[in-house]
Amino acid sequence: MTHLTASKPIGCWHQGESSPEPLDAAVENALLNVGRPIYVVDRQGGFAVSQTGTAELGRRSTGDDGTLPLHAYAPPLHPEALGDPVFKRTHGLQYAYVAGEMANGITSVRMVMEAGRAGMVGFFGAGGLMPTEVEEAVDRLQRAEPRIPFGVNLIHSPGNPELEMALAEMFLGKEVRLVSASAFVEPTLPLAYYRLKGIRRDADGRVVCPNRLVGKVSRSEVARKFLSPPSARHVGRLVDSGLLSREEAALATTVPLVEDLTAEADSGGHTDNRPAITLLPTMIALRDELAAAHGYAKPPCVGLGGGIATPQAAAAAFAMGAGYVLTGSINQCCVEAGTSEAVCSMLAEAGQADVTMAPAADMFELGVKVQVLKRGTMFPQRAAKLHELYTTYGSYDQIPAKQREALERDIFRCTFDEEWEQTRRFFIAREPKQVERAEKDPKHKMALVFRSYLGRSSTWATGGEPTRKIDYQIWCGPAMGAFNQWAKGSPLEKPENRRTVAVAMNLLFGAAVATRATWLRSQGIPLPGAAGSIRPMELADIRKRLGESPTPSI
């Protein structure tokens, strides 16, 4: 029996259909019954737990009225209750949970559909795909029955603003109402166009903005621009070009550029490796500052992504004020992910230290890096070598002969001219301007060839190309290792058992359990060490637990 500590009674408890049980024996099961209240009472000089009966806060138990002193109370906490209700209402969700976009269709149509059917939302990973491929994915998602909430990613293309605008126009034409903007260092014209097109006042005079843009940022200076109204410069250009009406432009100052903002901490892919514990409070404070300054009728919700891989991480995010949580790396190892079994197996063996930063294909010349898996692949080292050569030499011919031989033998597996011809065909189809420039600028030609290796390394991975396994580029953050450690010995240990909804519900259910354990501890109740820390469960077992939800009395 756990004996009373300095905890003082907060009220009295009237016994229900069952007697309280000793805390050490009953509290872990009680915490799992998240749909039922937990009462911790003084019974014969020790703490005991019940999930029935009624409580009266502030009333002292006299001992002769059939009551027991109440020392702590934890209300029911269904996973549906986690997060910001405004976020869930705005997007038509049951849970404040987002399956974040991973490029090249890794966050696949199938994954987005599964998330939507479960009351969550997923963003299709459109980055790196042709507009026709993105349009096909949108068509499939819009044909889903029943209709589901879904979003699509718009990734920053600093060297190809025409692609950004083409995608924005396609989203508007297809009436895609939810778009995630990622890897942006500042707002661009296509983002403002997507956000503001169709803005109007309803019959009651309220501003209606049909297109919801969710920004994903790591830096406060970028967040400030996303949380502010679209810039007057962009609005003016859109009006002058006839893309916005003057009526739409007049309402531009009434809304922030983004409907919601994801604070992106130490994530896979594009990341600034920010610590979540400092990033999220900063972003929330910035939101509050700008919402007050601009008088928004509906301030943006701020969520957290990057490192969300265990129930404790999700619980911590919600406790810090996250309106929602966003997952990425851990979804890549789910059966619905648009990647290969080989990648899933590699990810399932990763530890938290098995990641590193490597040059990014889409922003190679700028020196931008992405976080990738380093275990089982030589991509990080080879990509770093290519960037070193690019910054050192003015053309491929200037690279010493022995190094060129090594590149053509180990990385290209063909001559430079053959590699260039393949690269040229790729860019002719996507960005002809790049080819024109490369034929005049040998350094740019070298950059495009090096970028070609970086770009194809990710498609080799998603396609499971066996002859290129040593070159796989697998976007991954330390969250993957944390998830693997948590899942060890559970139904989710093997990648073939990892399904998007099962992973999500384990995180949310576990977060609810962990949160209630924290509530009890904060009231002075000394819980057993493992209380509140659960292992992954079968989805059916979670649903069974969630079915136990009588209405409490207090």
Predicted regions and their residues:
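Active-site entrance/lid segments in N-terminal catalytic domains of soluble metabolic enzymes
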Residues: 2-299, 312, 329-331, 458-554
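Catalytic or ion-translocation cores adjacent to nucleophile or general acid/base/metal-coordination motifs
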Residues: 131-135, 266, 312-371
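Phosphate/diphosphate-binding loops
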Residues: 160, 167, 171-182, 353-374
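Short secondary-structure transition/capping segments
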Residues: 171-179, 196-206, 231, 343-355, ...
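Helix-termini ("caps") and immediately adjacent flexible loops/tails
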Residues: 286, 336-341, 347-359, 367-394, ...
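Glycine-rich beta-strand-to-loop/alpha-helix junction loops that act as flexible
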Residues: 301-309, 327
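C-terminal catalytic or substrate-handling cores of phosphate/nucleotide-
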Residues: 374-443
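Glycine-rich phosphate/diphosphate-binding loops and the adjacent beta-loop-alpha structural elements
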Residues: 424-471
